[in-house]
Structures are given as C-alpha cells and as structure tokens.
Amino acid sequence: MLTAQEIALTPQPAHLTVKDGRFEFGNQLKAKVTPYQGDSIRMVFESFKKELQEATGIKVSSTQKEAKARIILDLNPQLPAEAYKLNVSKKQVRIEASRPAGFYYALQTLKQLMPRNVMAGVATSDHSQWSLPSVEIEDAPRFEWRGFMLDEGRHFFGKDEIKRVIDMMAIYKMNRFHWHLTEDQGWRIEIKKYPKLTETGAWRNSKVLAYGDVKPDGERYGGFYTQKDIKEIVAYAKKKFIEIIPEIDIPGHSQAAVAAYPEFLACDPENKHEVWLQQGISTDVINVANPKAMQFAKEVIDELTELFPFNYIHLGGDECPTRKWQKNDECKKLLSEIGSSNFRDLQIYFYKQLKDYIATKPADQQRQLIFWNEVLHGNTSILGNDITIMAWIGANAAAKQAAKQGMNTILSPQIPYYINRKQSKLPTEPMSQGHGTETVEAVYNYQPLKDVDAALQPYYKGVQANFWTEWVTEPSVLEYLMLPRLAAVAEAGWTPQEKRNYEDFKERIRKDAELYDLKGWNYGKHIMK
C-alpha cells in the first residue's frame, strides 16, 4: 500500500487516507453526473473527460444509473463552496461537492493520482494497465484567496505566456490572478476612450530598464492587450475557476499614462513627459486635483468593469511620491479644501471619489477595491473599512493594522513571497533582485497566521506570491523563478498549517518535475535533485 508521500498530491489535502486495492481503468468508463444550475457541473466534467480521452484514449460515456457508473459526481449541499470529497475504491470513483469549483478541484486531485502526462495533456498509448490507488479524501482550502501577481508594466509577455501562468496556478488550486497592467514603464491594456494609453504609453525606447551601470539599449519595446485579448484570457481563466484582478496603479507608478495624456494628467504639463526607461520610483504622478484626471480614472474603471466580471479591482497605492503635488498650486488648494496638511491624504481623497463613484454603478458593475498597504499611511477613515489591504512591506505588522481597523487583508510579504527574487545562491541564477535567500524552503516555511490573535484571523483572507519584472525580460526566466516556489505558496493557501511539512513537500514536488518537463515549463531543477 502506498504512503501519502508516494501518492504526491500538491497541495496536500486536509484529510487523506490510503486504503488497500486499486481502481482499474480499462478502456471505457461510464459516469453519472448530478444536474446543478443547468449544465455547470457537467461542463466541468466534460472538460476532464476530454483531457482524459486525448491523453489516454479512455472513453467515458454518460449514464443515469448509479449501479452502472464507475465515476459518480454527486451533489452534497452541506460542503463549503470550494470543498470536496473524493473516494476511490476498487469499484468506483465518487466525488461530492456543493459547487462547480469543488468538483473542479476534486478532478484536479484525481488527475494528480494519474500519470503526469494526463495533467500535462500529453498523449500516451500505454494505458491498458492504468489504475488509481484507493483513497479517501476530504478537502477544502484554508484560505479563500490563493493568489499570484504578475507585473507586465515593466516587461510584456503576451497572451500565450499568460495562459501558461494560469495553467500553473490551476494545477495547484490557486484562484486569484492579480494582473499588474500599468506602470511608469508601460501601459498594457487597451482603453477605447483613451487610445493614446496604448499608442504612446505601451511603448518605450529600451527593452532593459536602466539601473546603476545598466544603461538603456535604445530598442523600441512594448506591447499591450487588446480588449479582445482580455476577453479571451478572462474566458480561459474562468474555466479554471480563477478570477482575474486587474490592477491599474494610480496615481503613483503612472508615468506611462502621464506621457500619453500630459495635458490633464501631469502636474507640470509644460514639461516633456515620456514612458520611463528606468527601474525605481518615478515622481511623475497623476495630478489628482485636475477634474479631468478624476474623469479619466472613472472612465478607465468603466471599461475595466466591463472586461473583468469579477469582484475586485486593484488601484495600487504603493510608492506614490508627493513631491510634484507639493509644488502644484491646484494640489495645494485641494489639500486645504479637504482640511489636511498631509499630502498623502490627496491620494486617499482621490480613492474616496473613485470608491463613491463605483458605488453608484449598477449592482453587476460594482467592485470591491484593493490597495497596497501604504494607503494606511494616510487618513483611511475617509475610505471606510470596506476595502482590502494587500500587505507587502512590513507585511505582518501592516496586515495586523488593517485587521484591527476592520479591513480585510491579503498577505504578500516581500520576504519571502516576492518570487521574482533569486531562489538560490548558485552562480547560474539569472540576473534578478535578491541574494538567493528566498529559497523554496524559505517560501514554504512562512506561516501566514503566526502570532495573529484569533479575533483578527477572520480578516486574513489569504496569501499571494508576487512577481515584479524589472530584471525579467523572457518567459523562460519568469517560469524558472516561479517554479516550484509557486507551489509552495499554493500549499500555504490551501493546506492546514498542522499538515504542512517542508521535507514532505520537497519529496512530493520532485515528482512534478516530470509534469514540468512534459508541459515544457522551465523550473529550478536544482531543487528537484
């Protein structure tokens, strides 16, 4: 009988029991799927059935007679939305869940019990002797938010790579793709009301970003997603139960937007403005006192709510220098009008206007707002506590501060969850940030709720890995730095703390090297030895 470690499920289920015997596939199977809200569960199973047949040739047909079914998907209304039960015996595979997401995650687990080529979608003719270990699994995520953020403002990767990233997330039951689409160095999403955002803001005169001895290379570089592209990617993610959270970083980190429309976004429109060619933090922020800038932000949000039919929009809020506001007469006048002497409160005021505007929209277009934790430096009482704080710098303290104010929070600590940083001290590591201390082990061993009072824990909605791309220009480097650290964060988001063990994880994740190779994904091979 196999051990749980030999079965190698990642993330580790909440409860796993290995039993005697095996389920033999054969060449054909019958399945019974419980109807639910039209065909929503059946559509999840049809996708699995197609993948299984393409990879193995095994045909699955439908039956309404449970006695004839060898795979059964049965509704269990008592289970939480993403929870499932999976029972594999000698005779049948039985899955219970209350929502399509639970059935999807159960089928992801079922694929992990199979040879890795099924998960990879790679065909094989050698399936006649296939079997599954007999197991009983009761599983549910620890946190509702299990996220990954990709910065494409600095470097653009394109539609195909984004789908690969979504595939990586789906394998490990992650459910939030935070898409950082705007930066000082580039604006990556088509906004029809403001075409110059992509005509001008999506392009710059250097692929590499200047830093220290690294100088601009003069190469015309950029790219953006059309609204057609966005809709295609959203549809792709929805099939994998991943919500996409667009981030439009305003009013800071906005030099690309300012370069596109300096006449109403710049604090100093008389000066030259261009898409930034450097790393670091630009002082060229949006003039929040210009009514046309406020209108711009509202109309960008209008298009975002049409493109992303999910619950959240991220408006940034980090690293917003106030230097140009301090020199701008309009901004100084506005600060006086709102009764403050803290220029950071201009940012909070700006967000308050946008939050109030979103509240006037039809119910299906209203969105909850997320901000980086620097907004806590301003008078957040203006905003209210019905916002979410994404804690990255001084993350543990910031998350507690937000929770004490009654705000939901997501942990994305710079150390160790910034997985764009070097993952080892090996000389073969690609050029990136960090000193190689954000190893897989360091990422895995971070405990999200360590020293958090029980009364505050309900405000902690989950965890997120972040990937900033100042140094990363190629998909192969992106993937190398992501894998397998992404899986370590995924397990923190899914698996109960008492079930987590790094040595066990390391043995399980090594078996995914075959999956990565079959998918053609780059990864940290030194970790898999």
Segments and roles (model prediction):
Residues 368-374, 381-387, 393-529:
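Flexible, acidic glycine-rich loops studded with aromatic residues
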Residues 79-299, 303-312, 464-469:
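Feature activates predominantly on carbohydrate-active enzymes
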Residues 31, 99, 148, 169, ...:
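Conserved, mostly hydrophobic/aromatic
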Residues 5-143, 477, 489-527:
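Contiguous, structured surface segment used for ligand recognition
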Residues 257-263, 267, 274-387, 392-401, ...:
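Active-site neighborhood of glycoside hydrolase catalytic domains
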